[in-house]
């Protein structure tokens, strides 16, 4: 079977993205990784870190890189990069990495995209007059013409998808509607089947309120919104259980046999996942017409070029992309 080929965008050049991308040369992965970034920056960062990495120009027709080699699709930075120091001039470079990866998907060169972290603040500083940049997920959705995507994090056998994502806690209850729950659950169910190869995925659903509302005594979102949504989805053949109290749901005996958890909001599900995965978590965007995984951490500017950056999440993100490529065959 032909090895999948992934575009790995190296992210914010002043952060740890280039550092962790270099470690792919030693990861022995069952795929090809084309690192999109400035080849001179990668060479300089390798020298600063004392890493002996051979950088080779990416050629879709070649057989790939050997151990200790890294395939690079060279995209020059706009200005010189200093580790740990953001430069708004290079915001356009970061977006060009994504645009090049998307073009490679469209041309059939890449089987998916794996993203190292970018810095949303510096991108917004640079393009204040052209609209707000929300992040990788929204950018890739817009560029690919995808109406709705779902954020799911995975690590060490646990998958957690979110109904709502980056909202203030005071706005969460109003944002959780029956149509939203149903559409998120459908995307989650579809991609577990078609991108992970799970024939009949079992999804555990969290309630919103403590004790999942205690039958309406601690809030009505479960009885008025969540339960009716789950009943509709079950009639469609989707295998759902819940809603369960979140403090019960994440116990091992509950998770046994489950393929994913659907949490109602960001800090209901992700702290558990991140604690469970110990820095090996992966951010997965569901609903896109291609595979996209990412690290679950930020740019860590203070760690750039120090040798203290951990590439575990990036390597796991690539391994997850491979799993998805195999599941979608």
Swiss-Prot record:
What does the entry list as the binding residues for substrate? 136-137, 274, 283, 292
Specify which residues bind a divalent metal cation according to the UniProt entry for this protein: 166, 211, 266
Q: Which GO terms describe its biological process?
A: pyridoxal phosphate biosynthetic process; pyridoxine biosynthetic process
- The UniProt record lists the EC number as 1.1.1.262
Where does the protein principally reside? cytoplasm
Instruction: Please name the InterPro entries in this protein's record.
Output: PdxA, PdxA_fam
Entries under Pfam families matching the protein: PdxA
Class of the enzyme per the UniProt entry, highest EC level: oxidoreductase
List the GO cellular component terms. cytoplasm
Q: What does this protein do?
A: Catalyzes the NAD(P)-dependent oxidation of 4-(phosphooxy)-L-threonine (HTP) into 2-amino-3-oxo-4-(phosphooxy)butyric acid which spontaneously decarboxylates to form 3-amino-2-oxopropyl phosphate (AHAP).
Stored HAMAP family:
PdxA (MF_00536)
- Name it: 4-hydroxythreonine-4-phosphate dehydrogenase
Species this protein is from: Neisseria meningitidis serogroup B (strain ATCC BAA-335 / MC58)
């Amino acid at each position: 079977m032909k090895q999948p080929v992934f575009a790995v965008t190296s992210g914010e050049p002043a952060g740890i993205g280039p550092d962790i991308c270099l470690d792919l040369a030693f990861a022995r992965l069952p795929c090809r990784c084309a690192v999109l970034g400035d080849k001179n920056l990668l060479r300089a960062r390798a020298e600063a870190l004392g890493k002996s990495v051979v950088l080779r120009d990416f050629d879709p027709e070649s057989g790939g890189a050997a151990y200790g080699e890294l395939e690079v699709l060279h995209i020059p930075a706009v200005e010189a990069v200093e580790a740990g120091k953001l430069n708004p001039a290079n915001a356009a470079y970061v977006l060009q990495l994504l645009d090049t990866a998307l073009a490679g998907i469209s041309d059939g060169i890449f089987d998916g995209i794996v993203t190292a972290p970018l810095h949303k603040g510096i991108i917004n500083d640079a393009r204040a007059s052209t609209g707000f940049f929300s992040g990788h997920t929204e950018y890739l959705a817009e560029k690919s013409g995808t109406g709705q995507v779902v954020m799911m994090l995975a690590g060490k056998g646990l998958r957690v998808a979110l109904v709502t994502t980056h909202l203030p806690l005071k706005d969460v209850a109003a944002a959780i509607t029956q149509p939203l729950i149903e559409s998120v659950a459908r995307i989650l169910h579809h991609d577990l089947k078609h991108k992970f190869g799970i024939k009949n995925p079992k999804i555990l659903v969290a309630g919103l309120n403590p004790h999942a509302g205690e039958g309406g005594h601690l809030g009505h979102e479960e009885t008025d919104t969540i339960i009716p949504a789950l009943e509709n989805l079950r009639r469609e053949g989707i295998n759902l259980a819940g809603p369960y109290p979140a403090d019960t749901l994440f116990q091992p005996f509950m998770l046994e046999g489950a393929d994913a958890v659907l949490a109602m909001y960001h800090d209901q599900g992700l702290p558990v996942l991140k604690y469970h995965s110990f820095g090996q978590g992966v951010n997965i965007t569901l609903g896109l017409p291609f595979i996209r995984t990412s690290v679950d951490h930020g740019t860590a500017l203070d760690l750039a070029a120090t040798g203290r950056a951990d590439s575990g999440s990036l390597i796991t993100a690539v391994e997850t992309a491979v799993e998805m490529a195999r599941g979608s065959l």
